[in-house]
């Protein structure tokens, strides 16, 4: 769900304080500046459109929400598709790397309720509006229901702040890109 991706990316800068204390402060700041609902919405859209180009019998698509609700069943399907042996230990992953939860090396497994977090807060009506506006066709195709958020004052704020966001994000990411224009074209 692109709205859950939005919420995760909005909180990504907090990783340093949720157990990933080796992340430099500069990287946390860069993650905070990189977040904007229009940017993240466009990135999600571009990645979904790119994946849809490769739909054939050699590709298996599994929605994140489906996987975490039935991890055992979905992993068996994936292993069968890949023609590899299934082992239940494959699901014993460390619970680390979340933008919303503290790392817990003692806890293993899949968080089965780690979806639709955007419904319980964390995103404004404006963020939800832009996410759905930019992704409505792809969301519908993948079976995600629209929240029917409406254009509001906060939506206008995100629209007018977008050019400034792009400038600051480019400045903080220049060293990470070989060719700025090629990098932008690939992602949008």
Question: Which ranges hold each PLM region?
Answer:
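PAPS-dependent sulfotransferase catalytic domain
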Residues: 1-91, 101
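PAPS-dependent sulfotransferases, especially Golgi type II membrane carbohydrate sulfotransferases
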Residues: 13, 17-19, 33, 52, ...
């Amino acid at each position: 769900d692109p709205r859950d991706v939005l919420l995760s990316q909005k909180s990504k800068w907090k990783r340093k304080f949720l157990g990933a204390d080796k992340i430099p402060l500069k990287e946390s700041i860069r993650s905070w500046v990189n977040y904007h609902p229009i940017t993240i919405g466009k990135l999600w859209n571009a990645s979904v459109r790119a994946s849809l180009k490769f739909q054939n019998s050699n590709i298996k698509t599994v929605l994140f929400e489906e996987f975490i609700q039935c991890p055992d069943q979905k992993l068996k399907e994936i292993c069968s598709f890949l023609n590899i042996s299934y082992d239940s230990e494959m699901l014993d992953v460390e619970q680390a790397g979340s933008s919303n939860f503290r790392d817990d090396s003692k806890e293993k497994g899949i968080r089965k309720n780690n979806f639709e977090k955007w419904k319980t807060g964390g995103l404004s009506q404006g963020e939800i509006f832009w996410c759905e506006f930019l992704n409505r066709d792809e969301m519908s195709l993948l079976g995600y229901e629209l929240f029917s958020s409406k254009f509001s004052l906060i939506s206008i704020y995100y629209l007018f702040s977008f050019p400034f966001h792009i400038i600051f994000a480019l400045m903080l990411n220049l060293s990470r890109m070989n060719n700025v224009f090629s990098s932008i074209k690939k992602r949008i």
